[in-house]
Amino acid sequence: MAAQIPIVAATSTPAVARNSKKRPASPSHNSSGGGYGASKKKKLSASGFAQGVSIEAMNESKMASSELSSGPVEKAAKPLPFKDPNFVHSGHGGAVAGKKNRTWKNLKQILAAERALPWQLNDPNYFSIDAPPSFKPAKKYSDISGLLANYTDPQSKLRFSTVEEFSYIRRLPSDVVTGYLALRKATSIVP
């Protein structure tokens, strides 16, 4: 039985070399006897060797790169003009210190916090601020339909958007016209 293990190992390695398309870690790769468990042990020892070789190669490359970079040290010593040399990071706050990142408050929380503040009657708010008039021209709406009105009747000063509204406005009595103008707060004395 012990004599068969080296034979199995010898037959499994050429299969790896012959069929290079299969991954070496796949269970279908070890088709020879010995089962999955036996080949797993062999792979662990082989991968351990490969890792040892790669670590040694990495250490050698680091040493070689450090020998090459020892020449121009003057460029690294020059301080950057936009960095403060006396800056010391406080170390508290943020995710680095183990604190949670800030979360946004929703509208209810903001309003509740504002209500809890000691407001005076003279304090400015959005309703007490007098804003200057806008530079954009105000939109004009029809007095009859409420649609955007591009036209104004020169006789009654009512706004309209279509031809049908214009004919309707021309048939209105003067008291109804003054009522429409009063709704728009544009009362003008019409003779």
Curated annotation (Swiss-Prot):
Keywords of this entry: DNA damage, DNA recombination, DNA repair, Nucleus, Transcription, Transcription regulation
Chain spans, region Disordered: 1-41
GO biological process, one term: positive regulation of DNA-templated transcription
Primary subcellular site in the record, as a coarse category: nucleus
Highest taxon of source: Eukaryota
Pfam families registered for this protein in UniProt: YL1_C
GO CC list: cytosol; fibrillar center; Ino80 complex; MLL1 complex
InterPro entries: INO80C/Ies6 (IPR029525), Vps72/YL1_C (IPR013272)
Residue spans crossing the bilayer: none
Summary of subunit composition and partner proteins: Component of the chromatin remodeling INO80 complex; specifically part of a complex module associated with the helicase ATP-binding and the helicase C-terminal domain of INO80. Component of some MLL1/MLL complex, at least composed of the core components KMT2A/MLL1, ASH2L, HCFC1/HCF1, WDR5 and RBBP5, as well as the facultative components BACC1, CHD8, E2F6, HSP70, INO80C, KANSL1, LAS1L, MAX, MCRS1, MGA, MYST1/MOF, PELP1, PHF20, PRP31, RING2, RUVB1/TIP49A, RUVB2/TIP49B, SENP3, TAF1, TAF4, TAF6, TAF7, TAF9 and TEX10.
Described purpose of this protein according to its UniProt entry: Proposed core component of the chromatin remodeling INO80 complex which is involved in transcriptional regulation, DNA replication and probably DNA repair.
Record protein name field: INO80 complex subunit C
Organism (species): Mus musculus
Taxon lineage: Eukaryota, Metazoa, Chordata, Craniata, Vertebrata
